[in-house]
Amino acid sequence: MSIFSDISNITSKKRKLEVPKPKTNLFVRGIVLFAFGLLGASVYTIEDIDKTPALIFLCIGAALIIAGIISLICYGKQVTAFKKYTPTWEKHRSIFDDFAIELNHWYDSDMRPRSCDGDTSYILRLQKDRMARKGIRMIQHTSPVKRETMGTTRVPRKTSWYTVDLMYEGVDRHLQFQNSTGTIYERVTEDTMYETVVHTPNEQELTRMSMTCPNCGAVSPVAALTEGCPYCRTVFRISDLFPRVTNIFFIRENASTKNQKKMGKTTGITMLVFFLACFIPSFLDRESPIPQALLMSFFVALIMGGIFGYIISIIIFMTKQFNRDGRKRIPFWSYVTTKGKVKSAFAPYDPYFSFEKFEGQIISLIRMAIMSDHPENLASYCGGTLNPYFQDIIEMTYMQAMTVQNIHMEGSHLCMTLRTWWINYSEKDGSINRRGDCIDVTLRRNTAYMEPPGFSITSAYCRNCGASFDSVRQRNCPYCGTVYHMENEGFIIERLELV
């Protein structure tokens, strides 16, 4: 399922590594020099050759072996330096970096992020509150991935209201869970971090565009906030209100450096096995000259060992990918056709529909419902009692795998059931369990209404009296008592089921 909607709009800001990646050609050169040196030195073992040429071959071979060892030592030093190096986010490089820094501070020192909206802050608070009740503390630290990449990629989408950017970059994510006894779980993964950023509002639409006041949380037109919030009187500039991160999520990176290293090790081990299997019998057979045995063994190891090693590593990798953590419950064909099915369903009703934004919204709704101790109070959740297992989940990582189970219309209401794939961390009796889960979610949305810009579940806008209130904690407007129907503003969850 591609994350891109329009390849021509994609831009990237490359990130420079202060400590360069180890040079692979240095390693290859060391191996080649060592192999040729060993081959040259082995000529000295041939009894039928004159001693003078034999000594020359021995000296040349020794020199090549020394040169190869020096190259391998230099490569080893580069590997050591690169292992010790950790890339860092750059403040004010972009809002992507700024929010990444704020997110790290949120987990290690409880400093509230300033670059995100109220809904994103609310989900982070839900997660932290649940862990606090369980006596768990999570330390999450992200840093730019330690390899050559495109850097921060931006996919912009301009609407009549503002511009929405989907920004993402590969990150090294260090997760650590602690309780009163110390660290009880630790894991380092390579993920892709996604941020949805709203910026550059259309000034002609400021009176119709609602936004949560960064100071008091009330919903007001953006134009009113620039003149002074009607509730707290704080005056904001447009630069104070935008840009704003409206969604954040992580997706596990399957083609990670760790997997590449495993494939390389598998290939290397297979080549070594082929080399030893060919050389040892030839060496024991005194009739075969050692140079001939070495040359034949090198050839077999390089060709046969390399090919078989690569095939074996691919088979192991693919088997793990399609069978691990519940992945087998996501049929491949359904997976690759999901984006087209969802876009086709929304095409007649929403000309501004973006699958990337939709995917991010669904991820947030699921996380909010599962992280909430009282999901029945959420205006976005209208289902029954959730699986008790959900109450133990303390961290969720979406695996960028979603399939359509059902799509149909009920009057003007679009109803769909999706299957989503997650890696969840749960706490039970003081221990952390990591497992893959497939979660089916049934959604409903009234297509007769367009989703308003700046829509926030934590600060909803009453269509009857115009007041703003927190729809997370109550379904009725506290001022006029009108029932709030969130399906007229966005999606609601009707069912959430663990598969």
What are these regions (language model features)?
Residues 50-57, 289-294:
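Short, aromatic-rich membrane-interface segments at the entry and exit
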Residues 15-22, 75-79, 174-267, 317-333, ...:
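Short beta-strand edge/turn micro-motifs at domain boundaries
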Residues 25-45, 57-66, 265-285, 299-304:
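Canonical alpha-helical transmembrane segments of integral membrane proteins
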Residues 77, 81, 102-105, 242-358, ...:
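Long, charge-rich boundary regions
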Residues 112-208, 367-368, 372-460, 469-476, ...:
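Structured, amphipathic secondary-structure segments that form assembly/contact surfaces
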Residues 1-21:
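N-terminal Lys/Arg-rich, disordered targeting/topogenic segments
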